[in-house]
Amino acid sequence: MKIGFLYAGQGAHYVGMGKDFYDAYPVFKETFDNNSAEVDVKKICFEGPDEELNLTANTQPCMVAFAVGVTKVLAEMGIKPDMAAGLSLGEYSALYAAGVFTEEQVIPLVAFRGKAMVEAAEGRECKMIAVIGMEKDAVKEGCKKVAEEFDGTGLIAEPANFNCPGQITVSGDAQAVDRAAEVLKEMGAKRCLPVKVSGPFHTSLMKPAGDKLRERFASENFGDMQIPVVFNSLGKAKEDGESVAEILEKQVQSSVYFDDSIKYMVEQGVELFVEIGPGNTLSKFVQKTVDVPCIKVDKVEDLEKLKEAIN
């Protein structure tokens, strides 16, 4: 059976995530005790408070530490992916699973990424909304109308995540995003809901973060990819010769094509998805996109269900 690992992004995190794995599995505990991130991943993850964990510069290393730990637990059980993908931040966990990044490397790297993303948005009032019940092209068209209205102001609202059919996020400056919500509702969107993130991620406002990542990547070693990773900004695996560093630099400031990524993995023969991370957001996206099962691994008790699905 061909298995695809899917790694969660920001938004579903909660204080206490991973504590049951920490108590039950030494390989998971090792990740939380010995990582070299500048932030205290263990304390923030297990004790919070929410305000601390919700800060992007803290959320990112905590989420990736959780993902790395669970990946190691699954490997110990003999469960390894044939392909991997991740939503936004989750792409870094997917690259860890594929052998491109080491555990020692990836957690400090995403702490740097989180900080760079926060700094890119500093001084701007930003917002992200989830647009429910609207097609891709209509959302793009609505954002184009808003861009014309706000031309010359420097304010933007751009499609950020194409999560699954009927759910797309729009991100940017708060004023422009509020206007986009009005325009998209007038055009037939069922709802526009606020999303819990602290910056205009996956829009052109993140270019300064992309620039910082490019500089950081120059001093990073990228390992050989052991399994295919399906990239957010491509909606498919990379071609030979395409640089992972360039793709990741672009990823932070480009739309995420998660729906296309899921379809691509199924086309490549994936018969079971495993969602790694808090919550079950990606499982819902899979359910709405393809007819392939997805088992979430958020708590130790989820492992039984996964073993059953594989056997």
Each model region followed by its residue ranges:
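FabD-like malonyl-/acyl-CoA
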Residues: 1-144, 272-301
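Alpha/beta catalytic cores of group-transfer enzymes, especially the acyltransferase/condensing modules
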Residues: 11-12, 36-39, 98-253
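Non-catalytic positions within long, well-ordered alpha-helices that form the structural scaffold/packing
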Residues: 75, 185, 266-267
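Short glycine-rich catalytic loops that host catalytic nucleophiles or stabilize transition states
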Residues: 195-197, 266, 298
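A short, acidic, amphipathic alpha-helical segment used as a generic capping/interface helix at domain edges
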Residues: 254-270
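Short, charged, surface-exposed secondary-structure boundary motifs
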Residues: 302-310
